[in-house]
Amino acid sequence: METLVFNETKIDVNEEGYLKNPSQWTPELAHELAREANITLTDKHFEVLNWLRAKHAEGVALSIRKVGNSGIVDIKQFYGLFPGGPLKISSKIAGIPKPVSCI
């Protein structure tokens, strides 16, 4: 098992850096994960991240289309917020597992 140390706390991650335990996620950790992806988080980013976390907790299989239909952002905005693989990157920053729909 791999670990990430953040604020003197060990965080369990998988080989791709996704949190194994979403309850270890904090907004501060999200900022750090976003920095690693060269993203500066805004309130709009957190709206998306919180929506992703809520849907994951409900057991919803996430997809780019579902995010685009969320009412928070459309697909173009989603790509703008998380360039280079929006669902994959946003899920990692949100502290949830990589969605099955991501390669």
Question: Where are the regions that the model predicts?
Answer:
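A broad, low-specificity signal for short, low-complexity segments enriched in glycine/proline
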Residues: T9-V13, N38-T40, A61, I72
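N-terminal first-folded block
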Residues: L4-R35
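Metallocofactor- and cofactor-centric catalytic cores in central/energy metabolism, strongly enriched
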Residues: K20, A30-G59, I64-K66, P83, ...
